[in-house]
Structure formats: structure tokens, C-alpha cells
């Protein structure tokens, strides 16, 4: 997975993720419909993360679960954690793991610090991003060194917590960047408490770079979760948008499943 890690160091990719996850804060973007979208001036909106948080809260309430220990695998620059923090008041420990050092650096800046962000990379040409001062930034989730939020540069296989530790895990749009999807599901199962909940999403945009064994490519997330180990809670689809350059806009449809460990 070293190649996967190194590919997430380029500044153009950083610009794309910052926009996809934080454009409402950094650039003041609002959700717009397709008819008014202009890729030269418009930003994609992070509605994906807000919809995931809303779905998670609804499912947990229906199950009568008040999660305390929460893990986000492949947490990128931290928007999922931000939404869960504000959505789930019962949380008392949050762990984000992300293999990219650059993404971890930005998640710490955006989630834990109140410093000026300086110039941030902005989506521009395929060769390189532009740079601009953001209009705003999110308020930090903690203002003191309270031991609530931990951010680790790590893969899912190296989460520094014991088995059956977390009662809520999110793993969003990571599957098609993992060499062995079935082993990833086993990792989630090991880390979850009995009756713990996982929110798992993927557009299943697999390719040979990240998952060279094509027998591991899937078309439905439910095929990874065996009924003898998991109960189905929800199954839906949520749009996930990216702007890789100012003329390359991509919309994925991520399948989102919510499962409860038996």
C-alpha cells in the first residue's frame, strides 16, 4: 500500500480534497444544482459528509445506541469526524487514522487548531493548483489538550487500539483504494464491540493500481458482509463529488451500508 500512500502527496490532489470536504468554510460555497454549476468558478459542496452524519445519527437512534468510542478509517482531512462530533453528543473518544501525512497535517489544522491557515491549494489546472487565502475556517473541536481526539498517520491494519474497542466506525470511500477489501471488513469486525455499528461507503471505482487482484473487485458492498457476522441496518446511495481541475468535475454514486456486528 506504499504506492497508495505516496500518491496522496501531490498538491493538486490536496486541493481537490480540501475543496470536496471544506469548500463551504474555505470558499463560502453553497450547494447548487447542475444547471448553475460552472467548473471555472463553482466549488463542489461537501454535502456527502453531512448526509452520512445524518444517516448515522438516524440509524443509531433507531437502534437505541449512544456511541462513545468512534473510529474513522481513511479520515482524509477530517470532515467526517467534524460532522460526527457535532452530530453525536455521546462521543467521548474520537480516533482518525489516515495513511497520508499531508492529509493528517491538514486534519490537525482544521480540527484541532485555531491558527490562520495561510494560503491553501485551490483547484486549478491539471498540472498544478493555484493558492489563495480562505474566506473562513472551521472552529477547532477542542481548545485545550483534552484527550478526546486522536489523529494517527496509519493504515486500518495499524489502528493503535485493542480488539472490540469501538462502538462506531466509519470507513468512507476507502474500499477501492485497498488491495484486499475482504481483509478490510475483517479488520472492522475485530475493532468493533459486540453490537457495534459500521458505516461503510464506496463508489466501487476499483482499478489495478490500488487493487491489482481483480477477483477482489466488487459491485455490491453487501457481498462483503456475511449474514452470520452482521445485521443489515441501512443501504442507500449518496453522491460524492470531486473537481480534479477547473475543467474536470466528477460525480460518484457511493453505495452506503450500515451494519451492526452480531
Language model: regions and residue ranges:
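S-adenosyl-L-methionine
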Residues: 112-157
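Conserved alpha-helix/loop element of class I SAM-dependent methyltransferases that forms part
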Residues: 43-66
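Conserved class I S-adenosyl-L-methionine
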Residues: 67-76
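A short acidic, Gly/Pro-enriched loop at the edge of an enzyme's catalytic core
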Residues: 157-169
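Conserved SAM/SAH-binding beta-strand->alpha-helix loop
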Residues: 100
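A short glycine-rich, Lys/Arg-flanked "PGG" loop and its adjoining helix->strand segment in the class I
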Residues: 182-194
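Conserved beta-strand signature within the Rossmann-like core of class I S-adenosyl-L-methionine
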Residues: 195-203
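Conserved SAM-binding loop of SAM-dependent methyltransferases across substrates and taxa
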Residues: 77-89
Amino acid at each position: 500500500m506504499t504506492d497508495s500512500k505516496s500518491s496522496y502527496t501531490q498538491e493538486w490532489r490536496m486541493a481537490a480534497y480540501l475543496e470536496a470536504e471544506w469548500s463551504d468554510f474555505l470558499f463560502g460555497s453553497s450547494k447548487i444544482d447542475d444547471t448553475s454549476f460552472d467548473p471555472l468558478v463553482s466549488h463542489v459542496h461537501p454535502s456527502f459528509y453531512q448526509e452520512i452524519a445524518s444517516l448515522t445519527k438516524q440509524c443509531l437512534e433507531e437502534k437505541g445506541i449512544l456511541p462513545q468510542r468512534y473510529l474513522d478509517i481513511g479520515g482524509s482531512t477530517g470532515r467526517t469526524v467534524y460532522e460526527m462530533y457535532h452530530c453525536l453528543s455521546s462521543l467521548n473518544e474520537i480516533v482518525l487514522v489516515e495513511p497520508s501525512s499531508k492529509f493528517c497535517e491538514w486534519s490537525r489544522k482544521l480540527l484541532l487548531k485555531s491558527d490562520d491557515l495561510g494560503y491553501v491549494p485551490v483547484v486549478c489546472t491539471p498540472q498544478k493548483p493555484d493558492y489563495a487565502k480562505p474566506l473562513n475556517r472551521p472552529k477547532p473541536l477542542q481548545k485545550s489538550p483534552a484527550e478526546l481526539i486522536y489523529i494517527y498517520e496509519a493504515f486500518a491494519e495499524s489502528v493503535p487500539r485493542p480488539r472490540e474497542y469501538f462502538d462506531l466506525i466509519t470507513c468512507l470511500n476507502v474500499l477501492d483504494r485497498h488491495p484486499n477489501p475482504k481483509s478490510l471488513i475483517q479488520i472492522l469486525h475485530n475493532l468493533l464491540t459486540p453490537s457495534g455499528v459500521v458505516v461503510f461507503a464506496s463508489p466501487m471505482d476499483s482499478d489495478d493500481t490500488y487493487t491489482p487482484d481483480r477477483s477482489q473487485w466488487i459491485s455490491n458492498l453487501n457481498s462483503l458482509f456475511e449474514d452470520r457476522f452482521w445485521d443489515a441496518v441501512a443501504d442507500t446511495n449518496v453522491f460524492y463529488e470531486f473537481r480534479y481541475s477547473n475543467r474536470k468535475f466528477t460525480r460518484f454514486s457511493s453505495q452506503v451500508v450500515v451494519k451492526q456486528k452480531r
